[in-house]
Amino acid sequence: MSKPTREEATEAVRTLLKFIGEDPTREGLLKTPDRVINSYTEIFSGYGKDVEEILNTKFYDTCNFQDFISLEGIKFTSFCEHHMLPFNGTVHIAYIPDNCIVGISKLARIVNIFAKRLQIQEKMTVQIAESVQENLKPLGVAVKIAALHSCMSMRGVMQDHSIMNTMHYTGIFAEQQKYRHEFLNLTTKR
C-alpha cells in the first residue's frame, strides 16, 4: 500500500465534508481540509518515532538501585482505531531496574509515541510495558491506563463518565502479587 499524497488526503477531507452534507467551498470550510491534514500530521506523529531510539540512553551507575521506580499521571490523548474518535486519560508506569535506569522523561515520551497512533487501549497498555521490558531489561514492569472514550460518550451508549482501566505486568510484577498490590495501591490514590 502506497502512502497517498498530501493533495489526495486533502481531497479525501473535502469528500467527507460533502458526505456529511457540507459545502467545502463555503467560506468557513475553505481551509478546513488543509487544517485537518496539518492536525492529523501532528496527532498521528507516533508512526514516525522509534521507541528503541528514545530508550537508547541508559544510566548504569545507579548505586545498585533495585527498588520500585514509578512515573504517575502521564496525561495522553489518542484516537481509537475503530471509530477514529479520541480517548484520553492517564498512564502510570513502574519498573524495578536490574542494572540500568532511564531518564524519567523517556517514559512519558514512550507514552506519547504510542498515543499518537490509531490505538485501542488494551494494545497501548501492552506496547508501553513490553517496550520498557525489551529495552531496559528490568526485573519487571507495570503499566496502568485509565481513560475516557469518546466512542462511548459521543455515540452508541452515550456514557460520558465511564472510565476504562487496563493493566499489564511483566517479570516480577506478573509473578509476585505483592509488587502488583504495591503498584495498584500507589496508582489508585491518583
From Swiss-Prot:
GO terms for biological process: one-carbon metabolic process; tetrahydrobiopterin biosynthetic process; tetrahydrofolate biosynthetic process. SUPFAM superfamilies: Tetrahydrobiopterin biosynthesis enzymes-like. Zn(2+) binds at residues 80, 83, 151. Keywords: GTP-binding, Hydrolase, Metal-binding, Nucleotide-binding, One-carbon metabolism, Zinc. It is an enzyme of class 3 (hydrolase). The keyword Nucleotide-binding applies. Pathway: Cofactor biosynthesis; 7,8-dihydroneopterin triphosphate biosynthesis; 7,8-dihydroneopterin triphosphate from GTP: step 1/1. One of its GO terms (cellular component) is cytoplasm. Pfam families: GTP_cyclohydroI (PF01227). Its EC number is 3.5.4.16. It catalyses: GTP + H2O = 7,8-dihydroneopterin 3'-triphosphate + formate + H(+). Toroid-shaped homodecamer, composed of two pentamers of five dimers. HAMAP family: FolE (MF_00223). This is GTP cyclohydrolase 1. The gene is folE.
